[in-house]
């Protein structure tokens, strides 16, 4: 399969218009197929925020599964979305996609040995809390974040303890508020 015929790479590189025309050429998509399972992650790596949102939405509308774990590094679509700097994102537009990913089963508590938890990736994004506010609103409305997961085996710090110590302006307060509301774990 040529690279641009591979769903992941097509979703990652193409404009929405080009991707849609290519995608419409398929009678049916087998979302269990390894190549198609990765297409949503490819869409979330598209360099254009507008194309990213449109392609991801198209794939979700047609049955893409946000709960897929990408086996290379045990990551999911949240790890992929929570990457990059504010210059690469339209957080307001992408917040709608984020909500669909979470509602569709993307695991906010999935640990990658290489990249950690999705919320660790969100904390590491090169964007201000003001930029990230739309993402925070979606994430902290969820009842299923496990703040008790140990993220540092040396110190024994949990996710909640780590995020409360974040140098960010707003995130520590949001985490404290969330932990009070859910007793630290509500999965």
Language-model features: locations:
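Ankyrin-repeat-protein effector appendages
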Residues: 2-6, 104, 127-187
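Ankyrin-repeat boundary/"N-cap" motif
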Residues: 2-10, 30-46, 68-87, 111-126, ...
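Short helix-adjacent coil turns
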Residues: 10-19
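Intrinsically disordered, low-complexity segments enriched in glycine and mixed charged residues
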Residues: 16-17, 34, 106
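Alpha-helix capping and inter-helical loop/turn segments
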Residues: 47-50, 64, 101, 127-130
């Amino acid at each position: 399969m040529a690279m641009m015929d591979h769903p992941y790479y097509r979703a990652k590189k193409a404009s929405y218009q080009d991707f849609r025309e290519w995608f419409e050429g398929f009678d049916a998509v087998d979302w269990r197929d390894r190549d198609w399972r990765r297409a949503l992650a490819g869409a979330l790596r598209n360099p254009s925020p507008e194309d990213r949102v449109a392609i991801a939405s198209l794939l979700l509308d047609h049955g893409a599964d946000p709960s897929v774990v990408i086996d290379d590094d045990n990551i999911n679509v949240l790890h992929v979305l929570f990457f990059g700097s504010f210059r690469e994102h339209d957080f307001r537009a992408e917040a709608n996609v984020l909500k669909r990913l979470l509602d569709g089963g993307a695991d906010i508590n999935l640990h990658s040995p290489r990249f950690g938890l999705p919320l660790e990736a969100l904390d590491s994004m090169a964007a201000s809390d003001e930029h990230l506010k739309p993402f925070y609103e979606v994430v902290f409305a969820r009842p299923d974040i496990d703040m008790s997961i140990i993220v540092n085996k040396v110190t024994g710090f949990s996710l909640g303890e780590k995020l409360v110590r974040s140098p960010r302006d707003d995130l520590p307060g949001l985490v404290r508020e969330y932990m009070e509301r859910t007793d630290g774990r509500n999965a």
